[in-house]
Amino acid sequence: LKFERQTLRDVLNFHEVKWLEDPTNSDDSFERVRVRKLLTSFAELGLDKTKISKTASLMQSAKTALNHFAVDCYEKFGSCMYGDIIFDFEEFSNLPLDIKRRLLAAAQQWVSSQKYRPRLSQIDALLDSINEKTAFSGSGTICYSHDKSIKITRELNSCVNEIEAVNGLIFDNRWELSTSANCTEFTVKCLGENGLNFLDANVRKEIPYKTIIALPALFKDSALIDFPFLNPQSK
């Protein structure tokens, strides 16, 4: 908004930089084109590009401040364990609505390794489920209440199926495999129900069910070889 398109063209021409005009810039089927044409009408009403640009700048400044506060809140009563993002339920409940939304959106985006944050409608649905203390599935994550806390964990059905046990490979865009030798006869995949059956009943209780089944483990065919978060004990 700070610069006219013609100004940008002039700069490119001055520096003899080749450029192409985007043909969609004159296509009214695109919202941005229709909005750009409306700016002329807005200017006649006193709402010119300078004022809109200033408003956008103020909104960006407010966004930066809110994000800073959200980070501060996470550092005070948030944590990360077994790849889950965890919030204290009571502390989270006392936050302003906007900060709750920012924390949940960031948590879902981080846990799922998605490029874009979830839609606002999904975050609000997630907030409703938190207030009702029911589980919520969305954006490849599951959010649920556990021991006076809110947990955002990876959804098992959204995880990558499996990868070969090769040093340096990344599983599910989250976990890096570190091994002294490549073991291509082994695979890395989520622990799942099958792997869970290899663990002693008392050991399973150390990690919540929804979390543990989506954690990576080392398998040979269907047999659990290693689960780095616990010491598996064969039945």
Name these PLM-found stretches.
Residues L45, A56-K235:
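AMP-forming adenylation/ATP pyrophosphatase catalytic core
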